[in-house]
Every structure is written in C-alpha cells, then in structure tokens.
Amino acid sequence: MLEMTIRALIVDDSALIRKLLSDILSQDPNLRIIGTAFNGKDGLEKIKKLRPDVVLLDNIMPVFDGLKTLAWIVKECPTPVVMISAFGERAEEITLTAFEYGAVDVIQRPEGILSQNMPDMAEEICRKTRAATKANLENLECMRNRELEETDINKREKIEKHRSRKETTSFVRNVLAIGASTGGPRALEKLIGSFPADIPAAVLIVQHMPAGFTASFSKRLDSKTALRVKEAEEGDIIEEGTVLIAPGNHHMEIVQKTVKGRKEEVAHLSCSPKELGSRPSVNALFRSIAPIYGSKIVSLVLTGMNCDGADGAEQVKKMGGKIIAEAQSSCVVYGMPKEVVRRKLADFVLPLDKMAEEIVKIIS
C-alpha cells in the first residue's frame, strides 16, 4: 500500500535555510514542499491558505516569532509543528518552551551543504517530519491544558519540594530505565515530576533529541522535580535519587568499574553507530543494564515513532525486570510502546498519569 504524500510548509527567515530544507525534504518521495514563508506572519497566511500536513517552524524570527506563531497554530489551525532550532542557550530554551506550547518535535538547523554530518542530518529531518504527521494532537492539547491549569500554589510547592531533596546514594535498590522519542519531553516532565522525593531508585533516560538540547532539557527538568536531574557524563556513578539523561548524539550504557577501590556502576558514553536511526538508543541502554541489575529494573517505553526499546525490553524481561508500555490513549505517537505490546513484552500498559503510582507500588 502506497503512503500518502505529506505536504510540508517551511517557515524560516533565512533564505538559505529554506532552500536547504526544501532540498532535503524533496529527496524523500513521501514528502512534498507546498510552500515556504519568510517570517511568522507570512507563515500564518500560508497555513490558512495551504492547510499543510506539517509545519517546520524556525524558533527565532522577526515580525512574529516562533512561539507566537506556534501558539496561533495550536489554537486556530491545529497542525503538527516541528521546530527548527540552532544551538545556543536562548534558542534551546525557546525550543523547550515550544514543547509546552504544543510542538511535536525539534530538528537541528542545518548549517550548510558542506557539513560532514549532512547525510545523517537529512535522514533525521525527513524521519521527524514524517513522524510528526502521526502525532495525536488531541493528546498534545490535553497535556498543554493541564500544564496551563497549574496554579501558583502548585508551582511554589514544586520549588519547596525541589529544595528539600534527599541525599543520593550509590547503593541502588531499583533502576527505572525510560525511553522516549516524539512527544517525550512533555511526557517526561509530567512523569518525573510525579515521582516522590524519596523514590528508592536510580533513573536513567534516553530521549531522542539533538546534541546540545539534552543539556538544556536536563536543567529544565531538574527545576521541576524533587530529584536531581543532569545530563550524563562519562563515569557518572549510578545513584538513587539521581536522574541521568543520555546526551544527544551519544549512546549511554551502564558498565561496572572500580572507583576508589570500590566496584560501582557508571555511565559510559559512546559515538558507536546509530541503532534504528537513533543515537542515543533506548535499546543500547536497556541491553547494558539487563545483566547488571536484572530483577531490580523497571523499564518504561513511552511515546515515540518506530520500535526503539523493544529489543532491549526483551533482554530486560529475560533477566527478570518489569516492562511498562505507555497506553495509546496518552501517547503523542503510538509507535515504540506499540511494538512492545505487540511482542507481548509489557507487564503493564498504562496511560501516563497512572505510571508513577504503579511504579511506586512495584519498587516499594
């Protein structure tokens, strides 16, 4: 069965970037560029007129910036939006805010046709553009509405909770290993923010995200939870009460190593080949922890396209760990958890808002 052609609109104030993205997307037989726009205001007019299947939207533009444009799209003309973002703290922060507004995913701004990474970047841009069209916009809107309903009292409680964190310990009773892709940033904010400060577990996360963005995402998540959240670095010791997020463009695996005369489990980062088009890979993390932690593991496979995580989940299950797959009812894209369910690997299939409670029951 032939796939329907996906109609894409590019909104970016740089003529060079519009041309590069047009050339990249045009190489995919399932994608067709129906128009380009040079700023947010121009983009809104073309969205109303052309009704694209997906919009690629620059986050920083004159006249009408990316966030204002995104807010209008979400409210007036719901369409999957993939943000185009450069590196830099301001650009990364705007992009993370865009996820709260309703963006589906983010792509790295292509730097030029001579870039050595252009083939990989082009493949990722096309893949994320295709995946965005499968997003459940109703679930995105429901998550957005819940976030906007949060009161100032709730926010103050989160800050106080954050200040009263418990001490971390390298004695690990349980490991929560989480994999997510499209729709993952908002899902992770909700899930990790629901964990109690004294949860008896170390938390390891692979979120498919470009290099550079995971550092900003880690800082943002750290400010919204009672747990310590950081982007993983080579040699980080696995500790209860700490959340390690795999850095973009690096696989994160857990290995055993002697540290100051004591055997510890630590993070090992590598740039070995991508798996299923992704680096970091959920499978790589799950495979590495299975023989080390065995029945101490609870692996969660959240929203995302394709099937990363299923092979690794099989290894975890063989070693006695538990598997939780996100239910279709709360997924932005029901791909990764769907494969886990299809292969009958899931011990639990739960909507996002029921996961934290079940996890606490399992590990207590």
Curated annotation (Swiss-Prot):
It is an enzyme of class 3 (hydrolase). Keywords: Chemotaxis, Cytoplasm, Hydrolase, Phosphoprotein. Phosphorylated by CheA. Phosphorylation of the N-terminal regulatory domain activates the methylesterase activity. The modification 4-aspartylphosphate is found at D58. GO terms for molecular function: phosphorelay response regulator activity; protein-glutamate methylesterase activity; protein-glutamine glutaminase activity. It is found in: Cytoplasm. The active site is at S181, H208, D308. Residues 7-124 form the Response regulatory domain. GO terms for biological process: chemotaxis. Its EC number is 3.1.1.61, 3.5.1.44. InterPro entries: CheB-like, CheB_C, CheY-like_superfamily, Sig_transdc_resp-reg_Me-estase, Sig_transdc_resp-reg_receiver. SUPFAM superfamilies: CheY-like, Methylesterase CheB, C-terminal domain. Residues 167-364 form the CheB-type methylesterase domain. Involved in chemotaxis. Part of a chemotaxis signal transduction system that modulates chemotaxis in response to various stimuli. Catalyzes the demethylation of specific methylglutamate residues introduced into the chemoreceptors (methyl-accepting chemotaxis proteins or MCP) by CheR. Also mediates the irreversible deamidation of specific glutamine residues to glutamic acid. Belongs to the CheB family. Contains a C-terminal catalytic domain, and an N-terminal region which modulates catalytic activity. This is Protein-glutamate methylesterase/protein-glutamine glutaminase. It comes from Methanosarcina barkeri (strain Fusaro / DSM 804). The lineage of its organism: Archaea, Methanobacteriati, Methanobacteriota, Stenosarchaea group, Methanomicrobia. The gene is cheB.
